[in-house]
Curated annotation (Swiss-Prot):
Key words of the record: Hydrolase
Gene source species: Bacillus subtilis (strain 168)
Role according to the record: Is not required for competence.
GO cellular component entries: cytosol
Coiled coil regions in record: none
Family statement drawn from the similarity comment of this UniProt entry: Belongs to the thioesterase PaaI family.
SUPFAM superfamilies cross-referenced by the UniProt entry: Thioesterase/thiol ester dehydrase-isomerase (SSF54637)
Gene this chain is encoded by: yuxO
PANTHER family found in the cross-reference section: 1,4-DIHYDROXY-2-NAPHTHOYL-COA THIOESTERASE 1
Keyword Membrane: no
EC number: 3.1.2.-
Protein name: Putative esterase ComA2
Length: 126
């Protein structure tokens, strides 16, 4: 997956593990991902969550005839982070013919849960 000139590149998101069972992505907490008060921006967490779900879903579709696009995402931000790296772990909870649903947990460097997200992806024909 080419991440050049994408939101992923702009936010420093990297996919570090990607299988049908789970996708792990990491993102720095730095000047690109914080809000004006210096805390990790909730929108950056949501971008990380959707990235992990979308990347993971690539293992579950037929690339010759199908593509996955975001349909819905929500997030509960549980703790704040001011520095370091955050890690998203996305696991599928529903793999259907037309939708795939992931739950995503985001952790800080101390392995504290900072965000819980659910992302629904539509499986569409190319």
């Amino acid at each position: 997956m080419d991440m050049k000139h994408t939101l992923l590149e702009a936010l420093g998101i990297e996919i570090v593990e990607n299988t049908a069972e789970r996708c792990v992505a990491v993102m720095p907490v730095d000047h690109r991902t914080v809000q004006p008060f210096g805390y990790l921006h909730g929108g950056a967490s949501v971008a990380l969550a959707e990235t992990a779900a979308s990347a993971g879903a690539q293992n579950l579709i037929d690339h010759t005839t199908q593509a996955c696009v975001g349909l819905e995402i929500n997030a509960n931000h549980l703790k704040s982070v001011k520095e370091g790296t955050v890690k998203a772990i996305a696991e599928p909870v529903h793999i259907g013919r037309t939708t795939i649903v992931y739950h995503i947990h985001i952790y800080d460097e101390q392995e504290r849960l900072i965000c819980i997200s659910r992302c629904t992806l539509a499986v569409i024909k190319k």
